[in-house]
UniProtKB/Swiss-Prot annotation:
PANTHER family: SEPTIN. PROSITE patterns: G_SEPTIN. It comes from Candida albicans (strain SC5314 / ATCC MYA-2876). Keywords: Cell cycle, Cell division, GTP-binding, Nucleotide-binding. This is Cell division control protein 10. Residues 34-306 form the Septin-type G domain. The gene is CDC10.
Amino acid sequence: MSIEEPSTQHIAQPQKYVGFDTITTQIENRLLKRGFQFNIMVVGRSGLGKSTLVNTLFSSKLTTSQGRKSPSEPIEKTTEIKVASHSLLENNVRLNINVIDTPGFGDQINNEKCWEPLVKYVKEQHSQYLRKELTAQRDKFLADTRVHCILYFIPPNGQKLKQLDVQALKKLSEIANVVPIIAKSDSLTLDERSEFKKLLQSEFMKYNFNIYPYDSEDLYEEERQLNEDIKSLIPFAIAGSETEIEINGEMVRGRKTKWGAINIEDVSQCEFVFLRDFLTRTHLQDLIETTALTHYETFRSKQLIALKENASNPNRQSQLQKDQGQTSQQSNQDLKNTSGVPNAPMFQSTTGTAAAR
């Protein structure tokens, strides 16, 4: 039996109005009712302004500092995972956001493999999602805790990457969308900032990090150009501020320093606006889709292949069983919520609802 290939279709205009053009409105209405899920992890040493930046990005009080308030406070023994969950409402669009903080990262005397709890957390979220997918009677909409973006905070020291940062960026960029930023860049002069950015960009190329956004043949020309413009800015040199100050008679979000005052929304002084627009106005959906179609799909394929191989050889312990066993054990030890109250089974969080200001 031969199958006739479909011929090139001619695009015709219906003689009368049909109404299928309303499908975009139907999709929009359904999505608006459900809301959108976005999960962002912040990684960096204490004192780099991680909580302040997240609150500034979303113009809401989403998280509080989990680091040491003073040198007299004890250092966290291990890297922890703390999740804060909120719902933001802006112009009838609801964004359900999980902010994943990582107190203790890079703060120990011996920071060897301090990124492992982060890698395990990311993989565990993939593993949970896969288990839900493979359930015989799964929910219509699967709760998504997969990490869509990792903001990696680099100290503004003007030096090459430390081995800790090299290893962490390498491991994390293999499994998630990593966006490096220069924290508290207002501590640098514009010339120092420019030189430091060039140094870090050369370091990224040297170590071949898989930094987001990625190249793709599926992109339109304008999307490809936008990504090139963004890559030229990475790492974003930023400063965050949750307060308003007066500059030239105008109230703006900014910070006062010993050199004067900085308006964080002035692109000549700070790249905060570029980072905000990138994360929320141009690439929010792509971050979510890339997580699902690239990082999760890679994880899923490996796990299903391991399951198949394990089924054909009952005496062999599959990589899936190893990953799940190790990650679940670590989850119970490392993952605490911001209130310190135990919460089962895999990770713990606090929840809240806020309207974006």
